[in-house]
Amino acid sequence: MSKKYFYPVIFEPEEVGVYVYVPDIPGCNTQGDSLEEALEMVQEVIGLMLEGKKPEEYPQASKPNEINLEGSQFVMMVAFDKLAYDKKYNAKAVKKTLSIPAWLNNLAIDNDINFSNLLQRALINELGLNAR
């Protein structure tokens, strides 16, 4: 179910830290004190820039060898995992209204069934996320 999207990211080492930007996603840039931090930050900012879009609306990734670089810039392909991003940044619980037969509701209540927990487990299983 989860798919990773790969984008070429331009890293530009500076006197202090590393500036990074994603040419395929307008306005998608950040920086870090180290290469590792910049890599972590760019994965987060890709998620922020794609927030609210469906995967089919994500920009097409350029080919890394077609990107023009200057000076000490270099390109790395960076993976964006929407499921991992959502688990980290969109874990807030939301209310859902559902309808079930009264007899089933009564039986579940009599057996101390936690509806929220049951629905979460059922959705995880139905979506094939139980192995992740």
PLM features: residue spans?
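Short, charged, surface-exposed hinge/linker loops at domain edges
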Residues: 1-6, 44-111, 117-132
